[in-house]
């Protein structure tokens, strides 16, 4: 019953929102994609525009870049995306030897300046399309460069609206921050999870602040009482006693945490130490807490997350991915790994779609600018959709946002369980 209720309400909440996904099939029976204006930029050095293959086939080798934190505090996210993308590329390359993807992964250490340097390295390496960046602040910096250069980017997990705003070549596969905030409030209200809600968020982080703002607005609209709103910054993310005491004194029976898993792990530990045990509700940034080194997963028992991916889903595509990821990494994949897997598939299906509608496509040595215009035309084509492990029938709008329904999962006995 809970699954049915969740599916009905989330479909309504997000039916008109935009987000992304990719996967095994593309549906495009009505209307062909168009290339648009391909003269907005000159080809990269040594690159030329590709000619149609003539038979509807997709051929050649696509140089695909990935940017994310492979080291540093956010490395769990970056490596999850990298490993997911590598599995997808291996599968795609096995489908047809006439079309191959070459993957180039660059570390940005979750730093905007380093991320821009990584982007320049990818351009120097003749990369044509980019999956990334993984986190929001670096993506804001890189997306500005890519928009100016006319390089197509599909970010697996940078969820701020500012990432795509005013940039027609930047697309998201993840939920946008506003959608996460409003959907969370709706779910809490519809399922009567709380009478009094407290919020702890990072007011120095665009991701956390964006989700908080739309959560607060939607909660007010729904009559959901928010009794405590406290903040922290990256520099103060060690002691949450004051924030937890404020929530406890206000009588909160649910704590909404639109934050990443590192500070969330400390909040769970410190709440337990002080005997404060409200329901805990997070969003996609908390995914990964179960694999955090040194974290006692018993502290996360009963935590609810809103996410596009559930590793315990019973469909064949998810089961196959979970097995391959576990064989490769030795752990259950997170939502970030699933996003990383879906991104190369979305790009692959888009190129297939274009080739089928335009007599073929050979991407070898094709300029990133020409590929950018092709991918924009396909991703915004109403007849193009993608089925992936993070969503079925996903479509994009002209703002680069994807439309897909989230899933609620609860942590039970150290694993995610669909609700």
Show the residue positions of the predicted features.
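Positively charged n-region of N-terminal signal peptides that target proteins for export
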Residues: 1-10
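C-terminal motif of bacterial Sec signal peptides marking the signal peptidase cleavage site
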Residues: 17-21
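Extracytosolic ligand-binding ectodomains
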Residues: 23-419
